[in-house]
Regions:
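Cap/insert and terminal regions of metallo-dependent hydrolase folds
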Residues: 214-279
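A short acidic, glycine-rich active-site loop
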Residues: 52-64, 105, 165-168, 241-254
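Metallo-beta-lactamase
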Residues: 1-106, 110-122, 137-200, 217-225, ...
Length: 279
């Protein structure tokens, strides 16, 4: 039987605001998954080495807590949500995004644009509930064209390993009923809304995309899944998490972006960073 790893405590309140120039950025927690730490989590490092790094930071070694934190950007009258969490599909410790948005004063009905970094379930499942209804009914949903092309490609789905078929089905189910008036694809590097530019960071998935928010000469980088939990992967950028589809491309872009945000002293936010997920 699986060991009882306990349940992570969800922070309260589940949102954190910061101002940058004329922009307000709010991290809004969807939940935290506690997963047993096994050999497979870091694909290219022995478990003993992974555990030693956790121990050196005073962190537990039998499990890993993976938070899910979408971000809201309020700029120029726009209310933009970046990624959506697991919604009703993530068990009792997830699906808190809608209540935390309300608590932060930005109910789902106020969101006019949803930006999606990539199509893994913890980023897109919050778009709909189990009945299939849209959580952000008034919003345009903007997705990377390269990501959309990959997951909607029947040949890619047919060739995918068995463990990946479900992700293809999930992506298709999530986006299938969205018409062209709602679902918008954007090219790599496009300015998706005024003041927010997309940054291609392919590797974790074939169309994995970051977003850079600029205001008054300052920048905030939403790093999506460039690095999973930073206690492991920010300290060892060459380590590959089990979820990286192209580990070498992910490693390369991780090092490039880390160098960029370090030299520019940008504020960063990471979907799987410890809450409040700013860095």
């Amino acid at each position: 039987s699986a060991p009882n790893l306990g349940t992570p405590t969800l922070p309260s309140p589940g949102f954190r605001r910061t101002k940058m120039g004329d922009v307000e950025i709010i991290s809004v927690l969807d939940g935290i998954a506690r997963r047993p730490l096994g050999e497979e989590f870091v694909k290219n490092a022995p478990l003993a080495e992974v555990k030693a790094l956790l121990t050196s930071q005073g962190l537990p070694t039998d499990y890993i807590d993976v938070p899910f934190t979408p971000f809201v950007v309020i700029a120029g009258g726009r209310k933009v949500l970046i990624d959506t969490g697991l919604g009703e599909f993530g068990g009792p410790n997830a699906g808190k995004l809608l209540e935390n948005l309300r608590a932060a004063g930005v109910p789902a009905s106020d969101i006019d644009t949803v930006l999606i970094s990539h199509f893994h379930g913890d980023h897109i499942n919050g778009l709909r509930n189990k009945a299939g209804e849209l959580a952000f009914a008034k919003a345009k949903v903007m997705v990377p064209a390269a990501e959309y092309a990959f997951w909607m490609d029947d040949a890619k789905m047919a060739a995918a390993p068995a463990g990946q078929k479900g992700a293809f089905e999930n992506a298709r189910c999530t986006f299938s009923a969205m018409g062209p008036d709602m679902l918008v694809q954007f090219a790599a590097g496009a300015e998706v809304v005024p003041g927010i530019r997309s940054v291609a960071a392919y590797g974790h998935t074939p169309g994995h995309t970051l977003f850079e928010v600029t205001s008054a000469g300052q920048s905030f980088f939403y790093l999506a899944d460039l690095t999973n939990v930073p206690s492991l992967f920010a300290r060892n950028p060459d380590w590959a998490v089990t979820f990286d589809m192209d580990a070498e491309a992910a490693r390369k872009v991780r090092r490039e972006v880390f160098a960029r945000v370090t030299s520019s002293k940008s504020l960063v936010g990471g979907f799987h960073f410890p809450f409040p997920a700013f860095g």
